[in-house]
A protein has these predicted regions:
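Secreted/extracellular ectodomain signature
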Residues: 21-184
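N-terminal signal peptide c-region/cleavage motif recognized by signal peptidases
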Residues: 15-17
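Short N-terminal leader segment in a subset of presequences, especially plant chloroplast
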Residues: 9-13, 29-31
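Initiator methionine at the very start of the polypeptide chain
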Residues: 1-2, 20
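Sec-dependent signal peptide recognition
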Residues: 2-10
Length: 184
């Protein structure tokens, strides 16, 4: 089974990965990746020409992690259906967002495919992952709580769990799934 097929199966069965429990600020500091640089992985899925893959790699390197780029195989890279979903808290969430929006915009019959991923350099799965922007903002964390939205990539900090969730929801109207990821 291809990696993309495994990803789609995982997303369809499990939805977005959920953080089992919050971690402390000190634990978070040891789990988070540096906010830069990001590494780009191109997987052309047999639908990208070499020059398109090279161009996509150049564009993708400027996207904040976690990001995924989806294209419609019937329409190609230079289509309105091509979507980059960036600044999510996991690659799975970015992939689901990119595929969902691409499939909604495509005109061709074939389902969209992920052709690029952007992750932190040296990425490995960890119990806590934050988007690049949330990781940068974590530098301002001085206690309280930090909440995240798996679906949208939104986050918010506050003096309490309730304040952090409210700040997360306030960042993005669609962030209805905000949960506390870091709490002291």
């Amino acid at each position: 089974m291809s990696r993309l097929s495994s990803l789609v199966l995982t997303l369809s069965v499990a939805g977005f990965p959920a953080l089992a429990q919050s971690v402390t600020g000190d634990e978070a500091a040891s789990l988070l990746f540096p906010s830069a640089p990001a590494a780009v992985e191109i997987d052309g899925q047999g639908v990208l020409a070499k020059d398109e893959a090279k161009m996509l790699a150049m564009v993708a390197q400027d996207q904040p992690y976690y990001a995924a780029i989806a294209i419609s195989p019937d329409e190609g890279l230079m289509s309105e259906a091509t979507i980059a979903a960036a600044n999510h808290h996991t690659i799975e969430a970015a992939s689901a967002a990119a595929l969902g929006e691409c499939n909604a915009k495509k005109k061709g019959a074939a389902d969209c495919v992920i052709v690029a991923f952007v992750r932190p350099d040296g990425w490995e799965a960890r119990p806590l992952q934050l988007s690049m922007a949330a990781t940068q903002d974590f530098a301002n964390y001085s206690g309280g709580a930090l909440a995240i939205s798996a679906a949208t990539g939104a986050w918010g900090m506050g003096g309490s769990a309730d304040e952090a969730v409210a700040a997360c929801v306030a960042k993005q109207e669609a962030a209805t799934d905000c949960t506390v990821a870091i709490a002291d």
